Design a protein with these regions (language model features):
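Glycine-rich phosphate/pyrophosphate-binding beta-alpha loops
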Residues: 257-267
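Beta-strand-loop-alpha-helix segment that lines the small-molecule cofactor/substrate pocket
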Residues: 68, 73, 79-132, 146
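Conserved SAM-binding strand-loop segment of SAM-dependent methyltransferases
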Residues: 55-61
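N-terminal Rossmann-like dinucleotide-binding module
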Residues: 1-51
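Predominantly a Rossmann-like dinucleotide-binding segment in NAD(P)-dependent oxidoreductases
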Residues: 10, 120-125, 130-237
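C-terminal helical cap and adjacent loop that interface with cofactors, partners, or active-site loops
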Residues: 17, 266-274, 281-284, 291-410
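Active-site beta-strand termini and strand-to-loop segments that position acidic
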Residues: 245-251, 275
Length: 410
């Protein structure tokens, strides 16, 4: 079997944990690691040695890793600010490039990502793991099978109280963003699966958005409880506690996104798809089709009691990898979706297939941050969303991240 020699850039919590995931893929060797912090470099080397009994080269400067002729593919797990810049340098160095999710700081860096991809033709994938999650793929499969009818609306969220994480971790880079920016700062977890389902950049595209933000109260309230927070007692927090974004699409659909990371709430991506024949609700693991019984309940909790967790009844629509997933694979990050994302990356890289989440997708999804920042600053004024494909979206064929089964209704 062909194996790829991988270099990992960024060995924080995410990068270090994904060494397990990468090395669980038989297609990969990790031959180099890089981080500016020495203790993190040592931790990365030790983890590779523990798993594979081999010793990767450790680089303080990631550009030295990019010059290493033994490195064929690069995985970038640095801070948000560095993602696109590092990915551009990686492609220019001729390395197959995988980039962790994040946000854009301006539209021009999104255009530059696309330009460099088009110039170099180097395979690039943004590792949006939520595109590979079970419920998102189930919903997409049901949509492809026509079970939902014509899809007209989708909603997603990044609902995750991050205050403890931001104020406990000395190396956490999010806090600086929350002090300086007010935007939809983490759009791809919720938008990515929706965009794939709606064929964004492949027969459809996002046209415009409006964003509004609430006041910022949740983070300031907990500053006194943490030493790191006490340093910012007199600082203003720009990031609103709740940001709502509405996106219009060329084919007539509407997408809503919610950012909710500084108030008490359970984790949820709120993934919801509405069609003319049915809908899917991730929070309840629920799939509902049009029927008389839907109209019998005027108290929503009673409908939830009846249909909650019925998503398991439609497992026949799941891709093979989800129907056959092992416990070990599920333990390789976020219930299995991390492993599936890397398997898809290595398969495409080795076989020369199109990447399931490419540079056009990364640019379109990440630019939402910069545009939402502009919209919020202008009191919710609409912002046009660029067409990073420059018209190719009209003819690019559909590309799902996994193949869906054909299900007989007999």
């Amino acid at each position: 079997m062909k194996k790829l020699n991988v270099g990992v850039i960024g060995l924080g919590q995410r990068g270090l944990s994904l060494i397990f995931t990468i090395l669980a893929c038989e297609e990969a060797n990790i031959v180099a690691v890089s981080d500016i912090v020495e203790e993190k470099r040592k931790a990365g080397v030790a983890r590779v040695e523990e798993i594979r009994k081999t010793t990767p080269v450790a680089y303080e400067n990631y550009e030295d890793l990019l010059k290493d002729p033994n490195v064929e593919a690069v995985f970038i797990a640095s801070s948000w600010e560095e993602h696109i810049r590092m990915a551009i340098k990686s492609m220019r160095a001729g390395k197959i490039t995988a980039m962790e999710v994040g946000c854009a700081y301006d539209i021009e860096e999104c255009w530059e990502l696309v330009r460099v991809y088009e110039e170099t033709k180097i395979p690039f994938m943004m590792m949006e793991n939520c595109c590979f999650d079970k419920f998102e793929l189930l919903s997409t499969s049901l949509a492809r099978a026509g079970k939902l009818g014509e899809v007209v609306f989708a909603h997603g969220a990044y609902s995750h109280d991050l205050r403890f994480e931001m104020l406990e971790n000395n190396y956490n880079y999010r806090l600086g963003n929350y002090l300086k920016r007010n935007c939809e700062n983490y759009p791809t977890h919720d938008l990515g699966p929706i965009a794939k389902l709606l064929d964004i950049n492949r027969g459809n595209r996002m046209l415009s958005l409006v964003s509004v933000a609430s006041k910022a109260a949740g983070l300031k309230e907990v500053f006194p409880k943490y030493e790191k927070g006490k340093k910012h007692l007199n600082d203003a927090v720009k990031q609103g506690d709740i940001v709502t974004t509405i996106i219009t699409c060329a084919n007539g659909e509407v997408i809503t996104l919610t950012l909710d990371t500084t108030l008490p709430k359970h984790y949820s991506r709120e993934f919801t798809v509405r069609g003319t024949k049915g809908y899917c609700v991730q929070e309840a693991n629920m799939v509902l089709f049009d029927c008389k019984e839907l109209h019998d309940f005027y108290e929503p909790h009673k409908a939830l009691q009846r249909w909650m967790d019925n998503g398991e009844n439609y497992n026949a629509y799941l891709p093979d990898m989800w129907r056959n997933i092992t416990q070990k694979e599920m333990e390789l990050g976020h219930g299995g979706m991390d492993y599936m994302a890397f398997k898809a990356f290595f398969k495409a890289a080795i076989n020369g297939d199109p990447m399931p989440v490419d540079a056009y997708d990364a640019a379109a999804w990440m630019c939402i941050t910069a545009l939402s920042e502009q919209s919020i600053a202008q009191g919710g004024m609409p912002q046009p969303i660029p067409d990073f494909t420059k018209g190719k979206w009209l003819t690019r064929p559909r590309l799902d991240v996994m193949e869906f089964p054909t299900v007989s209704e007999d």
